[in-house]
Amino acid sequence: MNVGVAHSEVNPNTRVMNSRGIWLTYALGVGMLHIVLLSIPFFSVPVVWTLTNVIHNFGMYVFMHAVKGTPFETPDQGKARLLTHWEQLDYGVQFTSSRKFFTISPIILYFLASFYTKYDTAHFVINTASLLSVLIPKLPQLHGVRIFGINKY
């Protein structure tokens, strides 16, 4: 360990999801979202699970697949300017532990939401559409692909 030495990452955005405690913080955040939604008196348990799933997946889509660039000035001459956070994650290397975690977490949440909604058709369709909206952009075949030119610039 180099004490007193600045990080040497050209783009710190590439390694932030490997930081100590980020997975626990992520899981606690999803749990807190669920508890807050459960505390709203007129929501039933199936509605809360569906809302937790949809809000989580919407947030994941926006922060991982829609927002591009880095939140700070980097010395990489703007190479990351046109990449989403998912494409920058772990320098674009596929099947790393962080990518697996952020791929499996919406699937686990989907299974929980489906179970607690008792596989009701309306909830099932909403949860499935929400899951597919975050899983399809994570596929390795879609790395750097902009469908119909959406989010190209």
Swiss-Prot record:
Keyword hit for Membrane: yes
Topology relative to the membrane: Multi-pass membrane protein
Pfam families for this protein: ORMDL
Compartmental location: Endoplasmic reticulum membrane
Sequence intervals crossing the membrane: 28-46, 47-64, 106-123, 124-140
Swiss-Prot/TrEMBL GO biological process terms: ceramide metabolic process; intracellular sphingolipid homeostasis; regulation of ceramide biosynthetic process; sphingolipid biosynthetic process
Keywords: Endoplasmic reticulum, Membrane, Transmembrane, Transmembrane helix
Spans within the Cytoplasmic topological domain: 1-27, 65-105, 141-153
Gene Ontology cellular component annotations, sorted alphabetically: endoplasmic reticulum membrane; serine palmitoyltransferase complex
Entry annotated with the keyword Endoplasmic reticulum: yes
Domain notes: Ceramides bind to ORMDL3 N-terminus and stabilize it in a conformation that physically restricts the accessibility of the substrates to their binding sites in the serine palmitoyltransferase (SPT) complex, hence inhibiting SPT catalytic activity. In the absence of ceramides, the N-terminus is flexible and permits substrate binding, thus liberating SPT from inhibition.
Subunit text: Ceramide-sensitive subunit of the serine palmitoyltransferase (SPT) complex, which is also composed of SPTLC1, SPTLC2/3 and SPTSSA/B.
Purpose: Plays an essential role in the homeostatic regulation of sphingolipid de novo biosynthesis by modulating the activity of the serine palmitoyltransferase (SPT) in response to ceramide levels. When complexed to SPT, the binding of ceramides to its N-terminus stabilizes a conformation that block SPT substrate entry, hence preventing SPT catalytic activity. Through this mechanism, maintains ceramide levels at sufficient concentrations for the production of complex sphingolipids, but which prevents the accumulation of ceramides to levels that trigger apoptosis.
Similarity section: Belongs to the ORM family.
Protein name in UniProt: ORM1-like protein 1
